[in-house]
Design a protein with these regions (language model features):
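A conserved active-site cap/scaffold subdomain adjacent to cofactor or substrate pockets
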Residues: 198-240
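Conserved small/polar residues in nucleotide/adenosyl-binding loops
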Residues: 242-249
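A general structural signal for short secondary-structure junctions and capping/turn motifs
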Residues: 52, 127, 149-151, 157-160, ...
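N-terminal pre-ligand scaffold of iron-sulfur
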Residues: 2-112, 157-160
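Alpha/beta-hydrolase-fold enzymes
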Residues: 172-174, 178-207, 213-215
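Rieske [2Fe-2S] iron-sulfur-binding domain
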Residues: 68-172, 178-187
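Intrinsically disordered or highly flexible coil/loop and linker segments, enriched in small
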Residues: 60-61, 193, 222-227
């Protein structure tokens, strides 16, 4: 079992990663002699459970702020075992909530993004919430003694907008979002990310461990043949997915 120094994504001391420490150490060697992660990292349920608790509990990017630029615009994501959505309220604030009705626990939103008007309605028993998460309608509950709608609003999740990116923190304990983004903020500013508008999007459903997808994205040895346009902008051997600053920047 390997240990870990520092803090996890939520800012707390992490529990040991359920992989052989020697295998992990080999992946951290200089690239000339480093090895890949062991197979267990991609198929062991205990490893995935560790990742959900130690990685996905902290700041996670939900998407670009343009998706929630208008009142009622929303983004919905499945983060580990938890379904979350963000939306812009009538007061102009972007908030995040658990995508779970307070009545019987039904999923409220099923699309990954879209637009609602002034109400978010559960498809099961039609409980309705305003864009600030307050319960505004609960059919047949007026007959229930001591039922206080103000106590049954959606459960809010800590969120922030940094550099045009909507972030959520399921733990509620992660470090300051600006600290999490760190030096990447300068790149977000340089490319004017908050001002960008998405022209189109493509969704891929892949039956694979998330790290396999991440590794494919982060290595570019395949770029000369598969992505010649990107390869013309960034030397594939540098492993950089952005262009170098010009003397004028």
């Amino acid at each position: 079992m390997s240990g870990s120094n520092g803090a996890n994504a939520s800012g707390n001391s992490p529990r040991p990663l359920p992989l052989d420490a020697r295998d992990v150490e080999l992946t951290l060697q200089p690239v000339e002699r480093a090895t890949m992660l062991p197979p267990a990292a991609f198929v062991d349920q205990a490893v995935l459970d560790w990742e959900v608790d130690e990685i996905f509990s902290g700041w996670i990017c939900m998407g670009h702020v343009s998706a929630v630029a208008e009142q009622g615009g929303f983004l919905m994501r499945e983060i580990g075992r938890t379904s979350v959505f963000t939306t812009k309220g009538e007061d102009g604030e972007v908030r995040a909530f658990l995508n779970t009705c307070r009545h019987r626990g039904s999923r409220i939103l099923t699309e990954t993004e879209g637009q609602v008007r002034k109400r978010i309605q559960c498809p099961y028993h039609a409980w309705s919430y305003d864009l600030e998460g307050n319960l505004v309608a609960a059919p047949h509950m007026n007959e229930v003694e001591d039922f206080d709608r103000s106590c049954w609003g959606l459960l809010e999740v800590r969120s922030a907008v940094v550099g045009g990116l909507v972030l959520i923190d399921l733990s509620g304990e992660a470090p300051d979002p600006a600290e999490h983004v760190g030096h990447i903020a300068s790149f977000l500013e340089r490319y004017k990310v908050p001002e960008l508008q998405r022209a189109s999007g493509t969704v891929y459903h892949v039956k694979a461990n998330w790290k396999g997808i991440a590794e494919n994205y982060n290595e570019c040895l395949h770029c000369p043949g598969v992505h010649p346009e990107l390869n013309a902008l960034s030397d594939y051997r540098s492993c950089l997915l952005y262009t170098s600053p010009s003397p004028r920047d």
